[in-house]
Amino acid sequence: MGIPDIRAILFDKDGTLFDFHRTWMPGYRTIAAEVSRGDAALAARMLAATGLDPITGKLDPVSALAAGSNSEIASLWAAVADVGAAEAIAERLDSWFGAPGAIIPVPVTDLAGLLGRLKTRGLRLGVATMDSHAAAIRSANEFAFHHHLDFIVGHDSGHGHKPGPGMMTAFCASVGIEPRHVAVVGDTPHDMGMARSGGAGLAIGVLTGASPRFELEALADHVLDSIGNLEVALGLA
């Protein structure tokens, strides 16, 4: 298909700006082991209940681990572990991932360089994540691209959750650009669902997250190996 008149780009964070598996799975395994009190079989069941295939090690792209919030993960883990303390688990997830040095984000490319070039082209840029708003800001500051962003929204920002249109609608309202001029870039069907429900001009899938190519190809206008190929895909390189 041809490239529409794109004036803004809304990026997912984990699996799109950052390699999902290398960044997040070590932490989820650590907290699952903690909640299960070292019971490896129980920890495996908890991870499986939230989307991790115990045989292949792959994630279900629409699972809680791949596309949900810490609250969703905690509710499922509490049910499997029969501990009845979902709020406490969610708080532990938030505090663990929010602690300095707890995770080592692995960017898929030079984020400051890429977003800086896109900004120089006059594009408005945003991040919509199922992580918290505060965590998204920390990542943007840590990798020196916060000043290139016009908008950041998290699952706790009050604009709903993917695949609903709320996050995208809020982005469009914030930057004053109609949805048909927006490209949404993400790694899961939920990201593509947000693009479609929000009326985005382009839905672009990337393979640095939980979803295989065939799954994204059924939903996206384009599927890229990573956002490192985005400028070429948009005709900007």
Task: Give residue spans per PLM region.
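Asp-based, Mg2+/Mn2+-dependent phosphohydrolase catalytic module
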Residues: 1-9, 22, 37, 116-120, ...
